[in-house]
């Protein structure tokens, strides 16, 4: 299983995992993203090969925690157990002064980059085979480190002030900073 396979690390992970001739399950946010991904993946593999090994769990926007549960339901309904789970989905909207929120009222960067994966690991752990080779892999970033090239720009990461992860009763976030929110979401991983 892999999340966040549309581009970058996730996309190349999909290409390399498909070469192993194992069943690969890819979580895709929308029909549009599915079509874009397939068009690119088909440059590397023919459709017959993909029909054997590539399985897409579509319309699964990880910002909505209700969708995360649908992933578990998918595997249970098909009686599928997993050997490897790669949690790679990520979201960043640096520079914004206005937060975006999930269906559950959680700041979007934190909802996707941390909470969705945390929840997914916890609800899938019984479906990951108990073998020495089994893995749960979480990709992250070093921007939470103030000594890294990205971490020394803008506000520093720090979990001492978590008010911007969740909407206040008034519906407002306090002093929202998208860059700080991204760094904090990566620090949580």
Predicted regions located by residue number:
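Rossmann-fold NAD(P)H-dependent dehydrogenase/reductase core
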Residues: 1-189
């Amino acid at each position: 299983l892999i999340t966040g396979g549309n581009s970058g690390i996730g996309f190349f992970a999909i290409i390399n995992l498909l070469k192993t001739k194992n069943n690969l399950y890819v979580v895709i946010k929308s029909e549009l993203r599915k079509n874009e991904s397939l068009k690119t993946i088909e440059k590397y593999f023919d459709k017959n090969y993909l029909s054997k090994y590539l399985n897409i769990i579509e319309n699964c926007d990880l910002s909505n925690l209700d969708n995360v549960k649908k992933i578990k339901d998918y595997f249970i309904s098909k009686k599928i157990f997993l050997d490897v789970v790669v949690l790679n989905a990520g979201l960043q909207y640096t520079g914004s002064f206005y937060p975006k929120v999930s269906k559950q009222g959680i700041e979007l960067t934190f909802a996707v980059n941390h909470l969705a994966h945390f929840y997914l690991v916890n609800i899938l752990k019984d479906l990951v085979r108990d073998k020495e080779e089994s893995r749960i892999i979480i990709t992250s970033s070093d921007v939470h480190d103030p000594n890294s090239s990205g971490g020394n720009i803008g506000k520093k990461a720090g979990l001492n002030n978590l008010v911007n992860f969740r909407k206040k009763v008034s519906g407002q976030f306090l002093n929202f900073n998208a860059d700080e929110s991204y760094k904090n979401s990566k620090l949580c991983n």
